[in-house]
Regions:
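Polar, enzyme-active/binding microenvironments
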Residues: 1-365
Length: 365
């Protein structure tokens, strides 16, 4: 406790105004968390349906054992798409049917239909990977084969995307994750390597990194500020439960194998926050030659602080889907600290009196 420019008192960072004529006093600034504690799984193919869907399902990170909540929907049906975004909006792009548009989810109003944004990608492709920071989103790879990297400036998301650099090789069915400085595109059909985009210098060709412990496509990726995780994927029954971890501080090393998912699957998606990654959707894998390719509603959570353990089942999804996209305001180590806001508190005033006590009588001196 301390006194600063009386009549104010600073107590545990709370500023109290002792002016008896002011019943509302300044109570200091407080920073509210940026973004929302949710992840969104969007679109995909529903069992029994021959085409894409526009559904959006939200998982609450603070209550992740409950069934996902219906939100959205997207402005159009889509599958085989990928997402990234800021702490205000999530963007989904690169899909079937092929086009260059994206859907934007407003995290502060997620019951509304997503807003369509034109020409976010510089070329048409599906099965892309996506990654980004709080300012820009990057999409690359996919089929038809392309190495172009599209960048969207979130502050001008009606202006369309621009071409930025290239991957070192074509990739189909890849996944991306990263931190505030770098984005990593990993996997893809017949690919074990990764490509790293430097956000501070994003026009050169991406840098080869990794590799993963094995080839995989239809993979999902998520991570925090220090590590990226790639899990699930194809080939059948050889890679579908494996979790690979990339250490960003040593990103030329081969990924380390960590825990496992509880079931083998591919065409999954993933998102998360600083503590956990969530893998959702997909198609369960079976023995070669088996024709029953069932979908899964299970959401699997990787605990980054204990990543050698088997993933924990969460959710489930309210609607079973595969080939879905995912976004979250907590993904890719996006900052969670918001702008400071001013608080005030009501104080109880004293009485309008003053008192003098003690002292010496001058007649007695």
């Amino acid at each position: 406790m301390g006194f600063y420019n009386s009549p104010r008192i600073i107590l545990d960072n709370l500023v109290l105004n002792l002016d008896a004529g002011n019943t509302k006093s300044y109570a200091g600034d407080v920073s509210s968390p940026a973004g929302t504690p949710y992840g969104y799984f969007t679109g995909g193919i529903v069992p029994g349906s021959p085409s894409e869907s526009s559904i959006s399902q939200r998982i609450d990170y603070d209550s992740d054992t409950t069934t996902t909540s219906p939100k959205g929907p997207l402005s159009a049906s889509r599958r085989m798409h990928s997402g990234t975004g800021s702490n205000s909006y999530g963007y989904l792009a690169g899909q079937l049917p092929n086009n260059t548009n994206a859907d934007r989810i407003d995290y502060s109003n997620d019951t509304a239909t997503a807003t369509s944004k034109a020409s976010v990608l510089v070329d048409e492709a599906n099965r892309r990977g996506a990654v980004g920071n709080n300012s820009y989103g990057y999409w690359s790879g996919g089929t038809p084969n392309t190495t172009k990297i599209s960048r969207l400036d979130y502050s001008n998301d009606s202006g369309g995307g621009v071409l930025k650099g290239y991957l070192t090789q074509t990739r189909m069915g890849l996944a991306g994750t990263g931190n505030a400085s770098y984005g990593y595109f990993g996997g893809g059909m017949s690919r074990t390597t990764m490509d790293r985009v430097d956000y501070s210098n994003d026009t050169p060709t991406a840098s080869p990194k990794g590799p993963l412990t094995g080839q995989r496509y239809g993979v999902g990726a998520a991570g925090n500020a220090n590590y990226g995780y790639w899990a699930a994927g194809y080939p059948e029954n050889t890679i579908g439960t494996t979790i690979d971890r990339l250490d960003y501080a040593s990103d030329t090393d081969t990924c380390l194998s960590k825990g496992n998912l509880t079931e083998s699957k591919y065409w999954v998606t993933a998102t998360g926050n600083q503590s956990y990654g969530y893998w959702a959707g997909g198609r369960e894998q079976h023995d070669p030659g088996q024709s029953d390719f069932s979908y899964t509603s299970k959401i699997e959570r990787i605990d980054y602080s204990n990543d050698t353990a088997t993933a924990s089942p969460k959710g489930p999804l309210a609607v079973v889907v595969r080939e879905v996209g995912a976004v979250s305001s907590r993904a890719n180590a996006i900052p969670t600290a918001g702008s400071p806001s001013t608080r005030s508190v009501t104080q109880t005033n004293g009485t309008p009196y003053g008192y003098w006590m003690g002292g010496a009588n001058p007649d007695k001196s």
